[in-house]
Design a protein with these regions (language model features):
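Helix-hairpin-helix/helix-loop-helix acidic hairpins
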Residues: 42-98
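Generic recognition of short, well-ordered alpha-helical interface segments
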Residues: 29, 36, 67, 137, ...
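Phosphate- and other anionic-substrate recognition elements at nucleic-acid/protein interfaces
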Residues: 1-47
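Phosphate-backbone recognition surface of nucleic-acid-processing proteins
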Residues: 88-89, 102-147
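Conserved aromatic-histidine-acidic binding/catalytic patches
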Residues: 22, 26-29, 60, 91-92, ...
């Protein structure tokens, strides 16, 4: 079966570099949602293949999910490359467009006088305690990026 493709056109890709941090946060979250959808659909396709029940529609859904995930990653790459810190961070081994964009979108460096403030905001401070009835002392989406 031919690979299904959803192509991100040049105008949308160009617009990705001018997204606001708020818009980038939504796109990072969407990337992780699409990744989960792709993982689920791939598992379903494998399960159907093991039972010798090929499903062209399910395979198509899996391919579309993969294509959407790849296009969102490209858009996030354009966003990250539109910022000097994004370019720098993508040059570090292990940090790609999604993590770089997530850090740019979630971390406001003007509100973090030290790296410890960023660690705490990302849920990395072992002394942080989340008691019942209190607001969570870290950003759950930023904490997801650290994985």
């Amino acid at each position: 079966m031919n690979k299904a493709k959803v192509k991100l056109d040049k105008d949308l890709l160009k617009a990705s570099s001018t997204m606001t941090d708020h818009q980038a946060r939504f796109l990072v979250d969407t990337y992780y949602q699409m990744q989960n959808a792709r993982i689920r659909s791939s598992a379903q396709v494998r399960g159907l293949e093991e039972e010798a029940e090929p499903s062209e529609v399910m395979t198509w859904v899996d391919e579309i999910n993969l294509s959407l995930e790849e296009n969102i990653k490209k858009a996030l790459g354009k966003y990250a490359l539109g910022h000097p810190i994004g370019k720098w961070s993508m040059g570090i081994k292990g940090i790609g467009p999604v993590i770089s964009s997530g850090l740019l979108a979630y971390v406001d460096i003007t509100k973090a006088p030290t790296v410890g403030h960023i660690w705490r905001f990302a849920g990395q401070d072992p002394t942080s305690v989340w008691n019942k009835g209190e607001k969570r002392p870290w950003n759950v989406n930023l904490k997801t990026l650290r994985w």
